[in-house]
Amino acid sequence: MLKNKRNKRTWLIILLAVYLLILLRITVFRSNSYPIEMSVNLSLFTDLAATYRENGIWMVLYLVVGNIAWFVPFGFLLPMIWQKLKSFYIIPLGFLLSLVIESGQLALNKGMFEIDDLVLNTAGCAVGYLIYKIYRDFRS
């Protein structure tokens, strides 16, 4: 039983590592086919409002759902791997990961630093943690 639990944990750690590598590849270490202006947007949801005016609701939904969805695995996998990790650390760790990604995009000229992304990514981590809690309670 202990070996099976350790084996499961090992696979979850590998899954988390692969997820993080993919996330960093598509956000920070992507190749740009066009020049990106280095900028910081600290006005909450102004870019989403502009996107709505220019491209409609479907593009806004794509951006919102995408930013949330990319962080759901993080919020789910962390407590699956480290069950003793206190719940109040999960969401701040998601925020910190998002902050690292946004800062990396800015520093490497791979995208803008956007407060919207920080909020939506952190929300995605919270959704992932909520899914974990439902899963854990269901299994009990």
Segments (PLM) and residue ranges:
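Specific aromatic-rich, kink-prone transmembrane helix
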Residues: T122, A126, L130
